[in-house]
Amino acid sequence: MTEIVSRMSPIGPHLHYPDGDASLFWRNVRSSGEYAADLAEIKAEGERLRGQAPTGLTFSLFSQFAETGSRLEYERAYFERRRRLNTFALLSLLEPECEEHYTELLEAIWAICGEVAWCLPAHVSPERPLGETIDLFAAETGFTLTELRLLLDDRLPELLKTHIAGMVHARLFEPFLKKGPYEWEEAEHNWSAVCAGSIGSAALLLLDKDQDRELLGRILEKTQHSMTCYLKGFGEDGACLEGLGYWNYGFGYFVYYADLLYKRSGGELNWFAQEKVEAIAGFQQKCFLGGDAVVNFSDTLPYASVHIGLSRYISSIYDSVPSPPSRLRADYREDHCSRWAPALRNLLWREMAGNAPDWEPGDFLLEDAGWLISRTVSPKGVFGFAAKGGHNDEPHNHNDLGQFMLAGDGEFFLSDLGCGEYTKDYFGSARYTYDCNGSQGHSVPIINGCLQAEGSDRGASVLEQANGASESRMTVELSRAYDSQELQSFTRSWLWRKEELPSLELRDKFSFSKIPDTLVERFVTLIQPEKPSGQGRLLLVRGNFALELVYDDRQLQSEVTERTYRDHFGKDQVWYTLDFHVLQPQEQLELRFIFRFIS
């Protein structure tokens, strides 16, 4: 690493801009219709925020998490400060002649430099002083300020540039090298990529003098190790078990760092040459089930947009990764955490690949993850099906072996609740009492009163995975997920028929050592079911389609229950359980359901 660092190119505009011409780039952004929606969103935020004092980060707000377990109050104020910073930074780059933007920007930078800590209360530990705490957002903040220091360069007062550099050294570089190791340094999930990637990126953007080379080399050696650990969290199939949202987050910061590293090292350090990185890059397009509906196993939102910059950047590198449709571009205001790195690169990297009208149909077997995904396109519309095996100790784990979802024309008919409101208990011992996390909130059975248990030993065995032109199928063995002593085996089979209006056949086979007292099949939806005339049918109606659920009412008694849960944004959301009670449990039992789209 020492020799490579000694040969690194100087820091300059070539790290961000085509041909190194900043003024030409921003003139093009102002004049090109490609960016019109982005500019309107950024300017609207500027008008909303202009003249407002930065939101206060008081001790009482900071203490609320420790006292009540609630995160939202402090984080709303914290992220609003980042929104101010991002907005007036972008406006200052877009309209450098406007002194009002610049004045607001300086105040935003000064406010963030004045924060007692850049970390969130939820990530503070009594074992480590605040000044040494590096979490996701402390690392991101240092990366952001360092990048702004470079992009604005001589427009910033020298005092402020020196202050930013000093704070990044004190809050990131020195603790990273002298106060570790940090738990996230060898994490096999998004934390290693975001924390180490942000620190490594800040170093690549700040350390340029001869006397900085040794320090830069030490930081990069540790960062490279963390990136290796991050990639270990993926199988060769490239699936992100944390879900698409955390793919955008963790893999995004991996790419932001890898890009700067590649450019400063003149291509000598090239993460993009690894086959696994290419496989991970292809994960996003596999997740879309039609419209903005996405596979949302784990702590993931059910509907998603794309970071258009990140997506087009990786598409420009890999022929195997299609460019996303422009209509899925994330609105500038969408990111409630107001992250600078993707906001900037959604502009910087916009034109690195072209637009696509829509995702192509596709069937994807993710063998390491134990997922089957099918995106089916017919004259009637776009339909999606996804099912999973896996195990119950995945990152941001849900107890959900055998979970599946169905979507039609961008709407979910059978759902995964995804991520709930993040609180202290949500990541504590009470995690699986939350319906969105425990198996009670998933389309899996309750066996003899038992829900699924958590743990890496609670794993599914994939017995069959196959894709064909007209159908896709998967069979998994799931008995290890349950603590029911009488349960000897439980296999779940899905058969997805890719017709003009697709259908799914579900077969569950149970074997018990003695007859169970109860057995309940459960399916989860956000749609209030209708029970049409005739027996053995339920209808879920949304938009132009309905999903007809057909079952044997001689074998099963249906029960519909309306429930609520707190979503990721702290709002109560209604959902429904469709329970089917087995009327006469047996030692050997097979249950069959048909889910058929109708128009």
Task: Name every feature range the model reports, one short phrase each.
Residues M1-E41, P54, A77-F79, L90-L94:
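Extreme N-terminal leader/anchor segments
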Residues Y35, E75-C287:
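Aromatic-lined, polymer-binding surfaces characteristic
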